[in-house]
A protein has these predicted regions:
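Positively charged n-region of N-terminal signal peptides that target proteins for export
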Residues: 1-4
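Sec-dependent N-terminal signal peptides
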Residues: 6-13
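Conserved small-residue
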Residues: 24-403, 408-450
Length: 450
């Protein structure tokens, strides 16, 4: 009888292991951007419509559209990983997964690995102060299925294929991505809970005047309660002391579920410990990473649309580069953690909007759009390309996503720029180089040996 019971127990354990393995290794299938039930929102929007918004400088329409994009990206799917429901953007392939794929419609078996933001590395080549030896702000760069399949089909991460687009004494360029393409840069804060189950998170305060201001220098924090014991959506008062009182901590504490977040699994924790943080905390299965920011570009217009989102303690009154005007346009359909983020947009480089080529900075106004967690720490040494429009623009807080990404080329020699108009047919700037359709992620991840 004991042998029978022992045998049954072994069978049960074996079945459990097999079942767990199947669940653990279930594929994550990238999903298309969903239909979002928000009035007057359409994706992809017709380029003619967006260009009309630009002609009218209709920032209300532009911001409303960016909120619709955010709603779609953060919509829950019917897929789970490590017990957590995946949001739309979380199902998409990371850039290295795309680089390693030879077939369209590729799935993945894990969450995309987190890495130090490429722009931190690029910036550090010019200014070592951009980063230090420990990283708590980490990113992924992911492409939606349209963009991923296009990159794979056209071998856009293969050096020899990219070089085939070169034009002698001219400007080469890769093919334009499809108009439904979306590229995202989800950016996470990695923190370990203290003895009270609280994760301390730096929050942006938008200093005046502009300066190089890394998240490690902000000295303003909120706390995320991993047990979600706080009153939902309470008014937060961030702490500014390194040794706050119990009451100050209480007033600065929100629930973890007011951040988009996920739990590290064993593989994710091991990856971080091996690759990212050399002198700091050891991560383990079950630790949390919190989404604090995300750059998003869509190919709805020639120069792509650019919007960036960041978490803020008071989403109804976000700091610059967002605004109360932008917050007031947030649709009522956007709820939960996703509603706790602010938005900044750059659908043009300057106002009035300029043509792809033949435009000018003369008599224009700057459009400032950056992400505090990404560009906030950039100082003068980071920007290679001189700003002839506003020479005083020397900080990350004076940038525009479109202007900077216009300089994405195979050689990458122009580097980064602060906000100004970039003529895409500027032979002096782009001669004998290959434009990468505004995507620095191609330049940063291409295999030049293939």
């Amino acid at each position: 009888m004991k042998k029978i019971i022992l045998g049954l127990l072994m069978i049960f354990v074996g079945l459990f292991i097999v079942l767990y393995s199947c669940i653990k290794n279930k594929k994550i299938t990238p999903v298309q951007f969903p239909d979002v039930a928000i009035q007057n929102f359409k994706f992809p929007e017709d380029s003619t419509t967006i260009n009309q918004w630009l002609s009218k400088q209709d920032t209300a329409q532009i911001i409303s559209h960016s909120w619709g994009i955010w709603a779609g990206l953060t919509e829950p799917t019917n897929q789970k990983y490590n017990g957590q429901t995946l949001l739309v953007f979380e199902t998409w392939l990371g850039i290295q997964e795309i680089a390693n794929s030879s077939n369209n419609n590729t799935s993945k078996i894990n969450r995309t690995a987190l890495n130090v933001p490429k722009q931190f590395i690029h910036g550090a080549l010019k200014d070592p102060q951009v980063i230090d030896t420990t990283f708590q702000v980490l990113e992924t760069v992911s492409y939606d299925p349209w963009a991923a399949n296009f990159a794979i089909s056209n071998q856009l991460l293969t050096g020899s294929k990219l070089r085939s687009y070169a034009v002698s004494d001219g400007i080469g360029s890769i093919p334009d991505f499809p108009n439904a393409s979306i590229v995202t840069k989800p950016t996470y804060y990695t923190g370990i809970p203290d003895k009270n189950s609280l994760i301390r998170v730096p929050v942006w305060v938008s200093p005046v005047p502009a300066k190089a201001f890394r998240s490690s220098d902000w000295k303003t924090w909120v706390y995320a309660d991993i047990n979600n014991r706080q009153k939902p959506n309470k008014i937060l008062v961030p702490v500014t002391s390194s040794n706050p009182s119990k009451k100050e901590i209480e007033n600065a504490t929100c629930n973890l579920n007011e951040f988009i977040n996920y739990k590290l699994d064993e593989e994710g924790a091991e990856y971080l410990n091996l690759h990212e943080d050399f002198n700091s905390t050891t991560y383990k299965d079950g630790d949390y990473v919190l989404l604090v920011a995300m750059h998003v570009a869509t190919k709805e217009i020639k120069n792509w649309t650019w919007q960036t989102y960041f978490w803020c303690p008071d989403p109804k009154n976000p700091p610059s580069p967002s605004s109360k005007f932008a917050a007031d346009l947030k649709p009522k359909e956007l709820k939960g953690a996703a509603s706790h983020y602010a938005v900044s947009v750059a659908y043009a480089m300057v106002w009035p909007n300029q043509p792809i080529t033949g435009g000018s900075d003369k008599n224009t106004r700057p459009i400032i759009s950056f992400n505090p967690y990404l560009e906030g720490g950039f100082g003068p040494k980071v920007f290679n390309y001189p700003n002839t429009y506003k020479p005083e623009f020397i900080y990350g807080m004076q940038t525009n996503c479109m202007s900077c990404h216009a300089l994405a080329t195979y050689k990458g020699t122009a580097g980064y720029t602060t906000d100004q108009y970039i003529d895409m047919k500027n032979l002096k700037l782009f001669k004998n180089d290959i434009q990468l359709d505004f995507l620095w992620s191609i330049q940063g991840n291409m295999d030049t040996l293939k």
